[in-house]
Amino acid sequence: GKDDLRERLKEITGQKESYDVLYDPVGADLFEPALRSIRWNGRALVIGFAGGDDKIPRVPMNLPLLKGCAIVGVFWGSFRVRESKEELANFQQLFEWFNNGDIDPLVSDVYPLEEAAVALRKLMNRQAVGKIVLTTE
């Protein structure tokens, strides 16, 4: 639950205010307690609402004021169109990190292209954990 998250973050980091950046692609009930654990001048990146439209969090507006933090919407589709040079540079950096082994994305499932419908159904039912990869081999 909400209190468990804050306690777990304190346990992991040894600090009440645990991190500078909150990356949240899910939304839902844990956004507010996660925001309460952000450091002064932190940034909360709202990536999406994988938790579903009915789980879009509501945040007391005094919370960003008290934390001195920014809540930033990150919409990749618009960023890609409006800032294409930066988007290309970001992808080049990500692939460099990947090729060097600096990042290791979680791949939960691999399907042949012929089973794309199965993979898509898993995504639509919110059953995917990590990435799903389709292969052509």
Residue ranges and their predicted role:
Residues D3-E7, F79-R82, P112-L113:
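A short acidic, often aromatic-flanked loop/helix-cap motif at beta-alpha or helix-coil junctions
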